[in-house]
Curated annotation (Swiss-Prot):
Tissue: Expressed in brain, placenta, kidney and pancreas.
GO BP, sorted A to Z: protein folding
Gene Ontology annotations for the cellular component aspect, listed alphabetically: cytoplasm; cytosol; nucleolus; ribosome
UniProt protein name: DnaJ homolog subfamily C member 21
Record keywords, A-Z: Chaperone, Cytoplasm, Metal-binding, Nucleus, Phosphoprotein, Repeat, Zinc, Zinc-finger
Function description: May act as a co-chaperone for HSP70. May play a role in ribosomal RNA (rRNA) biogenesis, possibly in the maturation of the 60S subunit. Binds the precursor 45S rRNA.
Highest taxon above the source species: Eukaryota
Keyword presence, Chaperone: yes
Subunit structure: Interacts with HSPA8, PA2G4 and ZNF622.
Basic residues bias spans: 381-392, 455-464
Length: 531
């Protein structure tokens, strides 16, 4: 089969106008009517010209023909494809050449012809405008920089320009629809890409095989190694000479007299001696240093004192708690628990102050104390539990009064009854007075109640709020004198009084008025409880 471009005598990139002019010219030349002497040959040529123009004048037919031109020329799709390209596999052996000379079977001649044939095949598959200059292999005397190096640089990254259309399995012209045509084109493209990749790898492997055995490359590599070794030797020689030069400079170096440090300490001592002789022995400086040390110590002490003051400012003595910040201290001072503890502490301190200030107790101490405590007691809201605690000592007082009165026949004066009534009233207001009243009125037959001054609170929440206020030890040293109403004898304690009453029989029954007042007060308290 003849190429259509050759039949029309045009280039492969010819335009439509050029194709039309060439067709008309050849048609007039080979038309059978104008070649009567050679009608058969003219008819055959005219058919080829007409077929070529029919294909190339159609853009789609021309594009398909350009892609499959080599396959059609070498057998096409109708018959078996005859690949007449160079077989590169037989050049991967040393038996294909003999020696490294420039003769016909020498190394350089054989492989030079191989790469010239590969370049020719590439030129046939591309347009003239796209032709690149293929570097030649050269001979045994070729220069490395101008011939050998450019050759290997190009062919080691070789990419073929062939489209390998003869490898396609499907003829897209036979597709019934466009979807089937696209599927055929996709499969054909995969096959062409695979064949192109195999061709590129085959050529690159052949180049690597040749380069490994090329004497010119080996000679250049040896030359480069020698040059590198020479450069390293020169660099080492320069370093050695530099070291020798520095060693000579060190030997020639002489230290100046003003740079020596040997006599520096001696000179400093002499200077100090001169200054001491002229200005003194330096005691003032020592004193200054001592003063500075003292100032530093005083500063440390003052800092510690400030820290202690800061700690004292954030400490609550009533609740026995310390705080880290002023805000926490202020919040604590606003709490109900703190106010209650402050009131109890204030009351305790006032009582201690009164006990220390008065060496003797008046005839009616309960009346005076109760009046003063009623005036000085802080007015604050108390919880229900605290009110109940206050009412219990009053009931104990009434019970003791009833038991001791008729059972033992103790005589009670009207003054005592008045005292009991006043103390019962005071019990509702001050928890501290419960202690004093029960200590004076309770009989000694109940030693357990005598030991307990204030009932012990229970529970975690009321543990701090209801701490018992202990009676200070000093008032116990000042004994309260108790007198017998019959013989007016004074006793230091209630036990002594009751021993006297049992021994002498001076006990008298309480009057009816006092009993009535005691029972009435008890009934009122029971009513309050029932509420």
């Amino acid at each position: 089969m003849k190429c259509h471009y050759e039949a029309l005598g045009v280039r492969r990139d010819a335009s439509e106008e050029e194709l039309k002019k060439a067709y008309r010219k050849l048609a007039l030349k080979w038309h059978p009517d104008k070649n009567l002497d050679n009608a058969a040959e003219a008819a055959e040529q005219f058919k080829l010209i007409q077929a070529a123009y029919d294909v190339l004048s159609d853009p789609q037919e021309r594009a398909w023909y350009d892609n499959h031109r080599e396959a059609l020329l070498k057998g096409g799709f109708d018959g078996e494809y005859q690949d007449d390209s160079l077989d590169l596999l037989r050049y991967f052996t040393v038996t294909c050449y003999s020696g490294y000379g420039d003769d016909e079977k020498g190394f350089y001649t054989v492989y030079r012809n191989v790469f010239e044939m590969i370049a020719k095949e590439e030129l046939e598959s591309v347009l003239e405008e796209e032709v690149d200059d293929f570097p030649t292999f050269g001979d045994s005397q070729s220069d490395y920089d101008t011939v050998v190096h450019p050759f290997y640089a190009y062919w080691q990254s070789f990419c073929t320009q062939k489209n390998f259309a003869w490898k396609e399995e499907y003829d897209t012209r036979q597709a019934s629809n466009r979807w089937e045509k696209r599927a055929m084109e996709k499969e054909n493209k995969k096959i062409r890409d695979k064949a192109r990749k195999e061709k590129n790898e085959l050529v690159r492997q052949l180049v690597a095989f040749i380069r490994k055995r090329d004497k010119r490359v080996q000679a250049h590599r040896k030359l480069v190694e020698e040059q590198n070794a020479e450069k390293a030797r020169k660099a080492e020689e320069m370093r050695r000479q530099q070291k020798l030069k520095q060693a000579k400079l060190v030997e020639q170096y002489r230290e100046q007299s003003w740079m020596t440090m040997a006599n520096l300490e001696k000179e400093l001592q002499e200077m100090e001696a001169r200054y001491e002789k002229e200005f003194g022995d330096g005691s003032d400086e020592n004193e200054m240093e001592e003063h500075e040390l003292k100032d530093e110590e005083d500063g440390k002490d003052s800092d510690e004192a400030e820290d202690a003051e800061l700690y004292d400012d954030l400490y609550c003595p009533a609740c026995d708690k310390s705080f880290k910040t002023e805000k926490a201290m202020k919040n604590h001072e606003k709490s109900k628990k703190h106010r209650e503890m402050v009131a109890l502490l204030k009351q305790q301190l006032e009582e201690e102050e009164e006990n220390f200030s008065r060496p003797q107790i008046d005839e009616n101490p309960l009346d005076d104390n109760s009046e003063e405590e009623m005036e000085d007691a802080p007015k604050q809201k108390l919880s229900k539990k605290q009110k109940k605690k206050k009412q219990k000592p009053a009931q104990n007082y009434d019970d003791n009064f009833n038991v001791n009165g008729p059972g033992e026949g103790v005589k009670v004066d009207p003054e005592d009854t008045n005292l009991n009534q006043d103390s019962a009233k005071e019990l509702e207001d001050s928890p501290q007075e419960n202690v004093s009243v029960t200590e004076i009125i309770k009989p000694c037959d109940d030693p357990k109640s005598e030991a307990k001054s204030v009932p012990k609170p229970k529970g975690k929440k009321t543990k701090d709020m209801k701490k018992p206020v202990r009676v200070p030890a000093e008032p116990q040293t000042m004994s309260v004198l108790i007198s017998c109403t019959t013989c007016h004898s004074e006793f230091p304690s209630r036990n002594k009084l009751f021993d006297h009453l049992k021994a002498t029989g001076h006990a008298r029954a309480p009057s009816s008025s006092s009993l009535n007042s005691a029972t009435s007060s008890q009934s009122k308290k029971e009513k309050r409880k029932n509420r």
